[in-house]
Amino acid sequence: MTVGILGLGLIGGSMARAYAIAGHNVLACEKDEQMLQFAMLAGAVHGKLNKETISVCDLILLAIYPGGSADWLEENACFVRKDALVIDLCGVKREICRRCFPLAESYGFTFVGGHPMAGSQFSGFKYSRAELFRGQPMVLVPPRFDDIALLDRCKQALEPCGFGRFSVTTAEAHDQMIAFTSQMPHILSNAFIKSPTASNHKGFSAGSYKDLTRVAWLNPRMWAELFLENKDYTVSELDIYIENLRAYRDALARDDLQTLTTLLEEGKRRKEEVDG
C-alpha cells in the first residue's frame, strides 16, 4: 500500500513511522524541507507527496491544522484516485467534515473524519514514534453510519497503527465530547500554571501537580485554532466549570465546612459514576 501523509508533526510523523515499519511505501508533504529530509533519513518517509504522486496513494492521511487540511484537499482533490481513502486526523470534526464530505462525493473518492486519541505534551517529528497509537482509541466520523464495509476498510487501512478500539460518531457529537475530554483539560492546565506561586513549586509538588500541568506545554497556534473552531461547546463547558469553581471559592471564603464537604462529596461521587 502507498500512504500519503500531509504533515510530519507528532501525529503525522508517528503515522509515517508505523506504516514504514509495516513495510508500506510512505510519501509525505511537509512545508519544513529539513524535517522532510530528516524523516527520509530516518526511514519513515520514502518520497514526496505532491501533485505528481497523489494519484498513486491508496490512503491519504491529513495531519495538519484543520483549516489547512481542508484547504489542501480542496486544492488537490482532482489528483486523488477514485478508489483512494482519505482520513483526516484533526482534533475537531464539524468544519472539516462540512467541507470535505461533499468534496469527496463530487470527485468520487472516500473521505472519513478521524481522531486518534493519543498524543504527547511535545510536538514535532523528533518526538514521533511508531508505537504512539498502540492500544489507543480511534474515533471515526464516516459520511454514513450504515456503511459497514467502509468502517471495515478504515480499520484495515489503519491496522499498522495498532489502535486498540474504534468508535464511530457524528461530527457534532465528536466536537461536543472533545470540548470536555480534551480541550477543557488543556485550557485548565495552561491557565493553572500561570499562578505566580508556580515559580516556587519545586520541593512542594508531586503527582497531582504533574498530572494537572502536563498538557500546559502545548502547541499554542494549533490549540488556539482548535479552540476557536469548537468555541460554542468549549465556552459552554468553561461556563459550567467557572460556576463550579465559584461554588468552591465561596464556600472557602465563608469558612463553610458543610458546603465545602458536600461539594467534595459530590465531585467524588461523580467520578465514581462516570469512571467506575
Which residues are covered by each model-predicted region?
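Interdomain hinge/lid region at the active-site interface
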Residues: 200-270
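Rossmann-like NAD(P)(H) cofactor-binding subdomain of soluble oxidoreductases
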Residues: 74-126
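Internal alpha-helical scaffold of NAD(P)-dependent oxidoreductase catalytic cores
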Residues: 130-214
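Short phosphate-binding/catalytic loops that engage adenosine nucleotides
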Residues: 24, 44, 109, 163-164
